[in-house]
């Protein structure tokens, strides 16, 4: 039984779920905003905020952890250059989730997640 298991399953096996969240995190950092389902946006928020917190730390160990998660190495370097200046006054809450219209095919709740 899954009593009080806080990990969102997202209807996928663990390996597919991790790969999807890595891809969404990479896209969010690259583009600045992503349109996805509300459940995926909420799961993505945790991962994106963790990567930005690592970038604010700026240590070599943090950079290596981010490189192991984000698919694009050049994007990691850009994130570590920009994040400390952009988010220096924030202690968290680097993303914003805005609900949009439901998806046409299956009426799934959609949301836009963007970097603040």
From Swiss-Prot:
An example molecular function term from Gene Ontology annotations: structural constituent of ribosome
GO cellular component, one term: cytosolic large ribosomal subunit
Pfam families hit by this protein: Ribosomal_L17 (PF01196)
Domain of life: Bacteria
Biological process (GO), any one: translation
Annotated keywords: Ribonucleoprotein, Ribosomal protein
Protein family: Belongs to the bacterial ribosomal protein bL17 family.
Quaternary organization: Part of the 50S ribosomal subunit. Contacts protein L32.
Entry-linked PANTHER family: LARGE RIBOSOMAL SUBUNIT PROTEIN BL17M, RIBOSOMAL PROTEIN L17
UniProt xrefs under HAMAP family: Ribosomal_bL17
Protein name: Large ribosomal subunit protein bL17
Organism: Synechococcus sp. (strain CC9605)
Gene that specifies this protein: rplQ
């Amino acid at each position: 039984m899954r009593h009080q298991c806080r990990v969102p399953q997202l209807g996928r096996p663990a390996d597919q779920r991790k790969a999807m969240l890595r891809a969404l995190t990479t896209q969010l950092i690259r583009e600045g905003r992503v349109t996805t389902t509300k459940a995926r946006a909420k799961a993505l928020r945790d991962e994106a905020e963790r990567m930005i917190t690592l970038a604010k730390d700026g240590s070599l160990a943090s950079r290596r952890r981010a490189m192991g998660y984000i698919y694009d190495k050049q994007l990691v370097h850009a994130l570590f250059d920009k994040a400390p200046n952009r988010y220096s006054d924030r202690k968290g809450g680097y993303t914003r989730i805005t609900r949009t219209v439901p998806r046409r095919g299956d009426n799934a709740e959609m949301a836009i997640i963007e970097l603040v």
